[in-house]
Amino acid sequence: MSINPPRRLLQRCLLALLLPLALVVLPAHTAAAATGWTVTGPSAGSPTAAQVTLNDDGTLTFAASSHGQTVLSPSPIGIRTSAADLTTNLTFLQRSDRTVTESYTMTTGKQRSRQTAYTETTLSFSGTGGARLDVVVRASDTGVAYRYVLPGSGSVTVTGEASSWTVPASANAWLVPPDREDQGQWFATTAGGAPTNTYHQPALFQIGNAYALVAETDLDGRYAASYLSHTSGSATYTAQLEGGITTTLPLSTPWRTAALGDLASVTQSTITDDLAAPSKVSDTSWIKPGTVAWSWLSEHSSPSSEARQKQYVDFAQRHGWGYVLIDEGWSSSWVPDIVSYAKARGVQVILWFNSSDLHTAAQRDQWLPQVKNWGVAGVKIDFIDEYSQPTLQWYDAVLAQTANLKLMVNFHGTAMPRGMQRTWPQVVAAEAVYGSEQFHNRAAFDTILPYTRNVISSMDFTPVVFSMTSRDTTDAHELATSVVFESGWQHFADSPESYEAHPEALRILDQLPAAWDETRLLGGSPGKEAYLARRVGGRWYVGGISAGSARTYQTPLSFLGSGQWLAETVRDGSGGLTHETRVVTNADTLSVAEAANGGFVTALCPYTSGMSTCSPKGQAGALKGSQSGLCADVPGASRTNGTQVALWDCQGQANQTWTASPTGQLTVYGGAKCLDVKGGATSDGTAVQIYDCNNSAGQRWTVGSDGTVVNPDSGKCLNAAGGGTTPGTLLQIWTCNGGPDQTWYRANTPGAYKGKGSGRCLDLPGGNQASGTRPVLWDCNGGTNQTWFSTVSGELTVFANRCLEAAGGATANGTAVQIHDCNDTYGQKWRVRSDGTVVNLGSGTCLDAVDAGTANGTQLQLWTCNGGANQVWTRS
């Protein structure tokens, strides 16, 4: 007899049998879901992803991919403190997600206006004893990062991190070994083949077609910097903290960052700034990047000579360079005098300090307010050497005080900045590089820096040293570093005499800005070549450097805007630097021949008829209308934004004195205000006014060889309204028509040029106006054949349409000086120096009375500048 149990009883029995199986399976499924997390960039189909994994032993690893390729293999992460070891035995608690978008502006760098977007995931874990660890992961479309957050309160000691990066052992690597002041030499190797050592950050790795630049950012005195520790044969690089860390909770550690993608994406990355703390300086109007004349490298003893430093000030004034750095050796007895001397010439002074003189709060309270009272614009602080927590706390104090005093800062002999320039924007430069002062063969070395050190922050390389004989680079390579290397204070390290012996180099250096609106990598490879395009306003500069054999570089110009552009290239020629121009469009290709270990710079600016240079030329002085004979005037010497500029009798006052800046602005009141198209409008009749300089398109002006002053944004010319010629006629922009109401001359030097040695004037014999006529010395008589004007374009003209020139554009001593039809060549460009010499920009030599003659009829020539009485002229 069989017994059939009731159906309900069978169901209960089956449930009892299956339930334990369910209890086993479900927790296993939950654990699997919780042990791996992926964070992708914010855009649809983002190519970048970060992966965090919790392993069976409670350890964490971090990995990253780009375009579907694993770039950073799983590597240990975690942190150890005096309270807990948060590198192992971790248990997952929870996950939270958000999207982070930011816009911010930098005062320096490869791109002043920044926009960034990240996906952020916070993964919370508990460790032994219930200690809490949050791992915050961010992914953008071009990089990944993570940091640790430790909640709680009270003090804690950080004893180490497990943070590391792993790449294939065969990956190409570019590393810099530890060296005092971060001045080691970058070298190429493989990730596994690098010697056992610690290495500075950043470090660059190539994995297939992808690159990863690993670094850290958002570092201050709450923590310490780290090196990358590596064992030969391993492909893992682990963070090794510089000294002990005692800090307080809650704690957010610095970000461990990796810029990912192709070489252009990594080079153009701003991840170090994007993840740094926002600016602590609300008003940054006083922070002004610029070109600096610096004497120490070319003549070590010169900073102790006030007289020599004044010569550097004069040089900076002549060339529109904004700053002079007085290095070790200055004396407080004469610094106030030279600051006043420089200020009167539109030049600002930077002073060098040994960090030991600013080590304590008392020392800083003594010196920093003092130099501010002297009128010094900023300080260069040297010999800092390391980034331990006590040193970072010293940085915090210095940065807060210099911001409060409105002193700009350059840290020299320093470790690599790690986000400092965003948080403290008065830091316009930092060294942390094996720069020009090392006097080494460095063509290949130079081509690594744009992809590594200079990605992270502004780099004070002190470039462009022609007089250095122990180098393997050409002159054009030296010149090109002024564009390829970025620094908010670009310290050009040669002497005035050396630069003025290279006029083609000054053609570029005199117009370069020190901060950029946009940067693009056009091509290159670390250790071989680097080609970058940088934009400021409406003009571009392409700089290229190479190592190895001669080559021809070609690149499409598709990044240009519409219309015609003047491409002005300076490169190596058979007899030194050579200059060539070409009119191009964005459909053309730039092609430049490079010498071995050579380079080039190409300036690209909107083209107007007759242009042959992009250089904003001319000295400070009045703009005089050729039709009216009146000068561009700010009525009533007003400094109020929006005051419309008008014609008025020329009086030589500050409200009629205009200076062409290196970035194409026309400034008045020593650079305090700019000539501005009202509202940035482009229509005929738009008022031209003064306004705070803001680098906008409405403040850009290009000078044509015909004397027109063109706003490239509108394509319109500076114009006297209604063709007026009476005082009070307002100025506007109008369609360029070549009329006399659109033609301007620099009116700061009308009249005769009288020789100091002879007492006689520069004269055209018999009033001869024919091209080729040679001027001579003659008794001063005030005639039109002795009346010379300095044009906006830098020419010395006579009879309105003849220019003083070096015959045939020659540059040798003894070259005849003559008049010729004005053609905007450098043989017709002259600069009147403060010592009374008149320098030809094509040759760098001086207007000279032949054989030091003083008699009537003595002819003029070019000759090496020597300051003799036959080369000194006064204007009357």
Set out the residue ranges of the language-model regions.
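N-terminal accessory beta-strand-rich subdomains and adjacent acidic, glycine-rich linkers
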Residues: 34-275, 577
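Extracellular glycan-recognition/adhesion modules and their associated mucin-like linkers
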Residues: 614-641, 654-682, 697-725, 740-769, ...
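Aromatic- and carboxylate-enriched substrate-binding clefts and catalytic-loop regions
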Residues: 329-474
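An acidic-aromatic substrate-binding cleft motif
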Residues: 251-323
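Carbohydrate-binding surface patches
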Residues: 525-563, 600-603
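Secretory targeting and sorting signals
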Residues: 1-33
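C-terminal beta-strand-rich structural cap/linker in extracellular carbohydrate-active enzymes
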Residues: 583-614
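Glycan-recognition and catalytic regions of carbohydrate-active enzymes
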Residues: 123, 497-541, 573-581
